[in-house]
Amino acid sequence: MAQQTPLYEQHTLCGARMVDFHGWMMPLHYGSQLDEHHAVRTDAGMFDVSHMTIVDLHGSRTREFLRYLLANDVAKLTKTGKALYSGMLNASGGVIDDLIVYYFTEDFFRLVVNSATREKDLSWITQHAEPYAIDITVRDDLSLIAVQGPNAQEKAATLFTDQQRHAVEGMKPFFGVQAGDLFIATTGYTGEAGYEIAMPNEKAADFWRALVEAGVKPCGLGARDTLRLEAGMNLYGQEMDEGISPLAANMGWTIAWEPADRDFIGREALEMQREKGHEQLVGLVMTEKGVLRNELPVRFTDAQGNQQEGIITSGTFSPTLGYSIALARVPAGIGETAIVQIRNREMPVKVTKPVFVRNGKAVA
């Protein structure tokens, strides 16, 4: 039986089409995925992301533990509330999950991990935390609402107390602050400004309704996927998994190689991959009619004249741009163009950086 978030009833009242998403009943859309997508790019939309798992870590050796557990280095986190994106890797350098970590005090850090990987994440974290005497608290008492778009922060702030408004004033991206009963973070999964707001479960329904009244549009998983793909943001299980290295998933920037003496899980395997060469994640753009879909083959001829083949990891029609875009994992050496096989047709595509839209504007 699929689980329900504390906002399930609100979704049905808003006319959502509900689907089972990794064991959670979640809204796919509320009538028009397209309208929801455009609302986030031009105004303000909101997503129930309460299916994601918030994990609080307490203990005097928490920073030391996370420096070993994660490929990125929490030594960078020195300001209270600062957040960092990282892969959590296995010994062979594959991605167990991608997550966000927040620093509050030397003995208190917070992780936000994906719903699809919850059980294996918690098992992995618990197993490796043991020698560090870390107290692990899964915050199932909290709901999480993402409010995203150019007007999202302004509209969300109408629900805040004076203290909360003051706490978030001038807050830069990738920070979080506990203000009253809300944890407000300047993070998101859309390529737009906004907040991800955690609150006690019993407050979530009222908060959702108040956001609707403030003119924030409820958005489902469909729009969430087209928005994150336009923004070039990875989806676990598609761009990366336990068999795929962060180096092959455009996550190289999340690996902190320095200091060279920091030992983290997967480091040795990544160093070997870096030496030998690895696949890469690129963007594809197709302005001709048709849609680039997941798992379609991507073919190109490298500089040595050899035929090479990769695969589309995520593809869709981009509502913002008006043509098809995709992320693809390909062998190194791809040029500016490639061919994608769509049914019996060979379609030319332009190869770009793996990001297409930022703050409502085309970058591809």
Swiss-Prot record:
Protein name per its UniProtKB record: Aminomethyltransferase
GO function term, MF aspect, one: aminomethyltransferase activity
EC number: 2.1.2.10
GO biological process, one term: glycine decarboxylation via glycine cleavage system
Record's keyword terms, sorted: Aminotransferase, Transferase
Top-level taxon: Bacteria
Pfam family, one: GCV_T_C
HAMAP family, A to Z: GcvT
Protein's organism: Salmonella typhimurium (strain LT2 / SGSC1412 / ATCC 700720)
EC class of the enzyme, as a word: transferase
Function of the molecule: The glycine cleavage system catalyzes the degradation of glycine.
Keyword field contains Transferase: yes
Family: Belongs to the GcvT family.
GO cellular component labels: cytosol; glycine cleavage complex
Catalysed reaction equations from the record: N(6)-[(R)-S(8)-aminomethyldihydrolipoyl]-L-lysyl-[protein] + (6S)-5,6,7,8-tetrahydrofolate = N(6)-[(R)-dihydrolipoyl]-L-lysyl-[protein] + (6R)-5,10-methylene-5,6,7,8-tetrahydrofolate + NH4(+)
Quaternary structure (record): The glycine cleavage system is composed of four proteins: P, T, L and H.
